[in-house]
Amino acid sequence: MAFAYYVVGSYKRNMITHDPNTNVGFDFDFNIVFNNKHGYSPAKLKNALREALNKIAKKYQFDFPEDSTRVLTLKVKDRKQSRIIYSIDLAIVNENFTKYIHFDKTYGVNEYAYKWQAMPQGYENFSIKFETLKKAGYSKELRDEYLRRKNNNRDNNIHSRDILIQTVNDLYQLKGLYLNSSSALLLGHSNMYVLK
């Protein structure tokens, strides 16, 4: 199965932060897009990625991947200190980045637990809005506001990517910026690979 990967989130935008008093490690986010010309089910795609990661995880000091509702997560842990050094989140998305494979844990791990689901509200046109804010000269204001919100966040269920997306959407609206019909989807650098 061939796939492409795209760097997403704060790493792609040079906005990774570290607060030694509160953060434990950091993470990298990637979107995986399979060349799904055979129409494989979401479960088959997720299992193919999981099996490939299982084969290489230990070689690179990762634990085996953990399956959450949205991503497969690889973690490198400092076992002596009982902490995560860093992790990688891999979301499988469709080719136009409008849906991701959702894992419904109430079904257990089976064919029916995985389905395509629309991206959460706020994800649409995120890359375009981010680039528009940068080009309009709001990079520092965006970074400062993102850091303020991230440092004030006390809810472990709210991820950095969600804080970044909300900050971009709020600042975009606050500055009165609008998408026009000629806006193009800005994608990150991708590489093509084949799972064996």
Predicted regions and their residues:
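Active-site nucleotide-donor binding segment shared across nucleotidyl transfer reactions
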Residues: M1-F28, I32-G39, A43
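The feature captures the alpha-helical scaffold/lid subdomain characteristic of nucleotidyltransferase
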Residues: M1-F3, A43, D63, I84-S87, ...
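Extended aliphatic helical segments
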Residues: V7-V8, V24, V33, V71, ...
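Residue-level signal for functionally critical sites in structured catalytic/ligand-binding pockets
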Residues: S10, I16, D29, T73, ...
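Short, low-complexity, polar/charged sequence segments that are solvent-exposed and flexible
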Residues: V24-F26, L49-A52, G108-Y112
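Short, surface-exposed, charge-dense and proline/glycine-enriched linear segments
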Residues: F28-G39, A91-K105
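Glycine-rich loops and low-complexity Gly/Arg-rich segments
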Residues: D29-V33, K55-K58, A113-P120
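Conserved catalytic core of two-metal-ion nucleotidyltransferases
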Residues: K46-T98
